[in-house]
Structures are given as C-alpha cells and as structure tokens.
Amino acid sequence: MTIAIGKTQEKRGLFDVVDDWLRRDRFVFVGWSGLLLFPTAYLALGGWFTGTTFVTSWYTHGLATSYLEGCNFLTAAVSTPANSMGHSLLFLWGPEAQGDFTRWCQLGGLWTFVALHGSFALIGFMLRQFEIARSVKIRPYNAIAFSAPISVFVSVFLIYPLGQSGWFFAPSFGVAAIFRFILFFQGFHNWTLNPFHMMGVAGVLGAALLCAIHGATVENTLFEDGDGANTFRAFNPTQAEETYSMVTANRFWSQIFGVAFSNKRWLHFFMLFVPVTGLWMSAIGVVGLALNLRAYDFVSQEIRAAEDPEFETFYTKNILLNEGIRAWMAAQDQPHEKLVFPEEVLPRGNAL
C-alpha cells in the first residue's frame, strides 16, 4: 500500500473567494473600490439624467429646468431643495415625501440623491486609483491628485450649504445653474477678491500653461520618430523607447528664461503640485465662505469714495456692482422671501 504524504489544501474562506473574483484581471477592473464606485456613480448619473429630463423646479425655485419643459442642455438642471427643507437629507421614505416619488421629486429630493451618491462615487474613483496603483506596484500620486477635485466638489456642494441655512444655497446640477451660483458667490461674498480664489485661479491657469509648454517642448525635442517629414505621420504609438531629449529641452529653456528644470521628476512633480495645490486652496476658501468669512476689505477706499464723489477705484466700482447683484438676486433668487427693496437701499453711483 502506498501512502502519499503532502500538505492538504487549505480551505479557502468566503473573503478569499470574493477577493479573487473582484481583483481578477479583466477588461474593466472591479476591485473592492468598485463596490462603492459603480453603484453610486450609476445612481448619481441616473438621477441627474432623470432630473434634467423630466423633473421641474417650479415648486422649489419657481423655474422650468427640464427638457420636458423646453430647456436645453445648458439650461436644464437638477435643482436644490426648497429653502424650507433646511438640511434634511430628503429620504424618499422620510417625513417630507412619505414614500411618494412624485412629491419627493417636487421637493428637490433628486438633488440630495445626486449630491450624496456623486460624492461617494468620486471617493470610490479615488480609492480605485489607490487599489490599482497598489496592484501594479506604483506610487499613489494619481489618487492624491484626484483628491483636489473631490475637495472642491465636497466643499462647494456639501460644506458651503451646510454652513448656510439649507441645501437651497448650494449650486444646482446644471450649466446655467452653476453660472448663477458663481454670480451669487461674487455678489454675496466678493469671491474674486478672496485670496484663496486667487490661488485657485493661479493653480488652474498655471497648470494649463505648464501643460501646453510641456507638450510643446516634448514635441519640439523629438529626435527619433520615424522617417516622415510630418511629426503626426511619422509618430509610432507602439514605439517602446524614449524619443525626446531632456538635455535639448533643458538647453532651450535655459536660453529662454535663464533657468530650467534639471530632471524629469522635479518637472512632473511641479506639474502635479501647481493645479492640486490651487484646487485645495479654493476648497479651503469655500469652507471659509460657508462660515461667512469675508474677502479683502479696503475700507479706507470705501470711506473716501463715500465722502468724495469724484474718487473711485476699481475696488469701489466692484463693491457697487456686488450691491447690484445682491439687490437683484435677493428678490429674484429667493422669491419665497417676498423681498421688496425701497429705492433708497438700491445701489447708485457712477459705477452702475
């Protein structure tokens, strides 16, 4: 009789089986992060398409905001709940809608649905980048970079209205609706004169400049890209080896500016640092606005302009413009308040 001696196969638990299935190499990687990403992204996008197609904002804003009512892609939106709803999460089964889907849509329940599921979807996408980076053994800088737009989304759509009286003051999900919100930010918070906004603009525009310069420099310093006279005809996307000269690029920018990046790591870290830091600063600024912190105030100029009708600066002109925005938006944007302003409080002066 023959006796085989060997290790018995260990019994695999449910976690190991699920882990193998989730992290299997397939066309679309799922992963553990996919359990959060895919359902929430699907529901957020589905809620947005449903709202912009069918749901009116007549009951919350007195507006038409759906394709069904004649709006187009630029003017359709999923609008914020009514101001009377405060910070209620507006669950379909909650005391406001009481399980009535039509009533839930009328109250603005789709906005909280899209905002919360969208936030978790963005977080799931960042976790997906962490998970895949760990699987292929690279650094997680993509995920860290993606935290910047997440911080902006969360600060604008969630933290800002939490600091105000209700979800009503958050942006609605639509193109024209976002533009209205920008006007609101300027009129009520003087956002363009906020140093955190300035850092955000510098980050975004600086990143665009760096991206354009970097792409042009790489194209300019190609030394091996095929036999054709035209770069685009000669470029071979399957070519494995590097085809541009960092030394030549360094020499070029040293002649242009007198300084240049000495290595690729510092160059690309700088391209990462500029936009990400700018967006983080913008998010911090919006958190400040949630607490109604003010931007720069040049009170001495305002006092002098009030005393001397001939004295005016671009700052005092902008202050008058902000007063005009507030006077218009308070009545137009919050009709439920039934605000009526006497002529004495409306802005006047040669700025308008």
From Swiss-Prot:
State its role.
Photosystem II (PSII) is a light-driven water:plastoquinone oxidoreductase that uses light energy to abstract electrons from H(2)O, generating O(2) and a proton gradient subsequently used for ATP formation. It consists of a core antenna complex that captures photons, and an electron transfer chain that converts photonic excitation into a charge separation. The D1/D2 (PsbA/PsbD) reaction center heterodimer binds P680, the primary electron donor of PSII as well as several subsequent electron acceptors. D2 is needed for assembly of a stable PSII complex.
Q: Taxonomically, which superkingdom?
A: Eukaryota
Where does it live in the cell?
Plastid, Chloroplast thylakoid membrane
Instruction: Describe the protein's quaternary organization and the partners it interacts with.
Output: PSII is composed of 1 copy each of membrane proteins PsbA, PsbB, PsbC, PsbD, PsbE, PsbF, PsbH, PsbI, PsbJ, PsbK, PsbL, PsbM, PsbT, PsbX, PsbY, PsbZ, Psb30/Ycf12, at least 3 peripheral proteins of the oxygen-evolving complex and a large number of cofactors. It forms dimeric complexes.
Xref: InterPro entries: D1/D2 (IPR055266), Photo_II_D1/D2_sf (IPR036854), Photo_RC_L/M (IPR000484), Photo_RC_L/M_CS (IPR055265), PSII_PsbD/D2 (IPR005868)
Specify the enzyme's EC class, one word. oxidoreductase
| Protein name per Swiss-Prot or TrEMBL | Photosystem II D2 protein
Write down the membrane topology. Multi-pass membrane protein
Binding-site positions, chlorophyll a ChlzD2: H117
Write out the similarity annotation.
Answer: Belongs to the reaction center PufL/M/PsbA/D family.
Which one of the record's GO molecular function terms can you name? iron ion binding
User: Membrane-spanning regions, if any?
Assistant: 40-60, 124-140, 152-165, 207-227, 278-294
Sites binding a plastoquinone sit at H214, F261
